[in-house]
Amino acid sequence: MTTTDAPGHTLTTDPRPHFRSAARTACATVEAVSVDQLHLPTPCTDFDVRALLGHLVAVFRRVTSVAAGVPAVGHAPLVTDVPDDGWGAAARAAVRQLEQAWADPDVLRREMVLPFGTLPGAAALASYTGEVLTHTWDLATATGQIPAWDDEVVAGALVAVRRKLPTAERPPGIPFADAVPVPDDAPAIDRLVAWQGRDPHWRPVA
């Protein structure tokens, strides 16, 4: 079953397949990062590559916790207890636990407390799909990777985040800057990360 949000875009009522796809792309990107890249800057200006890896794993763990009814507010933004060569395994393990936590369809109907408001589980997971994709783009761009984005998943995430985030003057608790203008015909991933406050043309300083 699907619901139409805008012409040409649909949102599935069960966001778990899209989240799984985003998580797989994230894990593949994490596993391709080498130890000598951990110090590099990223488009997410608060984090270098090592910190961004810690944040991604923390996001996966947070999404697991909210499924169990734990408010997302107050969770540590970074995981710091992973060895430099262990990020791929840590990400995979976190995603396995997350998928188990969300296996019951009833979780999609539960109210969940997020930093930016209280949402049903389905809407919360759709929003987190956009966050995972954006941070995967951050990581890939910082380390010279070009992931195989699933345009349907990216477009669905863009619909979800546009529902939740205004273009500018974003409220407290939103971890993204104001939207960056991009052409309407830009690639789906560019439109998503731009809405999340990223410059799609960002590249590391040579």
Indicate residue ranges for each PLM-predicted region.
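Glycine-rich loop at the start of a catalytic domain that most often binds anionic cofactors/ligands
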Residues: H55-L56
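Extended, alpha-helix-rich binding/interface surfaces that flank or overlap catalytic cores
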Residues: L52
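Structured surface interface patches that mediate subunit assembly and partner/cofactor docking
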Residues: T2-T25, A32-T45, R62-A93, Q97, ...
